[in-house]
Amino acid sequence: MSDNQQPVVLGKLGSSHGIKGWLKITAYTDSVEGIFDYVPWLIKDQGVWREVKVTQWRFQGKAVVAELEGVTTREQAQMLTNCEIAILPEQMKELDDNDFYHRDLIGCEVTNVNGYNLGIVDQIVETGSNDVLLVKANAKDAFGKVERMIPFVTEQFIKQVDLQGKQIVVDWDPDF
């Protein structure tokens, strides 16, 4: 299965809440309640993805708790603690132009406008004002760089993103 076919992890199941099988939810979505916009969920239970349905959810203080279909006891809920919550890639919402999912940018080759290969996107760092590409430099980088941090600011630094070709072109000095 390729990376684009793998389930997309949106959160994880936390500890049990109460005696009726409810679970605390840790969501990686922009808003905590945004995870409930995706139906159905997949959970990775004992190494195998399986589909689950959320029957209801609510805020519980600062936490969010949910009831899953078929989970009716505290013991059943405890068996699911720390299971990842995911969806199929085709369930991902369509984005506007110049918006990208982090998972799609990771692994892209980054070159500058002069054709110099700066390396591969290893991760995305969220800074609050804008995301930053953490680019792992090639082993034989002519400038001796191990990694570069390039602000993901379209028009100013990011000139082109080709997700099909896994290429990003940037206006960036390789010595910086």
Curated annotation (Swiss-Prot):
Keyword field contains rRNA processing: yes
Keyword rRNA processing in annotation: yes
GO molecular function: ribosome binding
A GO BP annotation: rRNA processing
A cellular component annotation (GO) from this entry: cytoplasm
Domain of life: Bacteria
Swiss-Prot/TrEMBL keywords: Chaperone, Cytoplasm, Ribosome biogenesis, rRNA processing
UniProt subcellular location: Cytoplasm
Cited Pfam families: PRC_RimM, RimM
Annotated ranges, domain PRC barrel: 97-176
Notes on the domains: The PRC barrel domain binds ribosomal protein uS19.
Subunit (UniProt): Binds ribosomal protein uS19.
Protein's job: An accessory protein needed during the final step in the assembly of 30S ribosomal subunit, possibly for assembly of the head region. Essential for efficient processing of 16S rRNA. May be needed both before and after RbfA during the maturation of 16S rRNA. It has affinity for free ribosomal 30S subunits but not for 70S ribosomes.
Family: Belongs to the RimM family.
Protein name: Ribosome maturation factor RimM
Protein species of origin: Shewanella denitrificans (strain OS217 / ATCC BAA-1090 / DSM 15013)
Biological classification of the source: Bacteria, Pseudomonadati, Pseudomonadota, Gammaproteobacteria, Alteromonadales
